[in-house]
Amino acid sequence: FSAHRTPHKVEEYGRHAQSRGLKVIIAAAGGAAALPGALAAWTELPVIGIPLPSSELKGIDALYAIAQMPPGVPVACVAVGSWGARNAAYLAASIIALSHDGIAASYRAFRDNQRQG
């Protein structure tokens, strides 16, 4: 959904994310990229923002919008596009792994496998 076109949906999603059992929110957005920051305003959960290359600026506008959040409304920002999407998933897994042994073991195995080449 769009933070600009459907702000009521953003509020609803953010306010109730934790009670629905979510541990981390991943939000992708292009252009003005308000979605990650708007969600962060409505939840205490970690929010990871993925800037998308949706305009002539190839995602630089979205990168700045997500990375330049004001103090007190943090959003973790990953790379633009598909690499960012992958890293957002890995970052979310590492956060959830702090309190979930099964995910911790799987994530550790994934990282060990990466190091092996």
Annotated model-derived regions:
Residues 8-13, 36-39, 60-62, 87-88:
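Short, well-ordered secondary-structure micro-motifs
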Residues 1-7:
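Short beta->alpha junction loops
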Residues 58-117:
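C-terminal binding/interaction regions
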Residues 5, 33-34, 83:
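Short alpha-helical
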Residues 2, 52, 80:
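Cofactor-binding loop segments of dinucleotide-utilizing enzymes, especially the Rossmann-like FAD-
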Residues 13-55:
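Glycine-rich phosphate-binding loop
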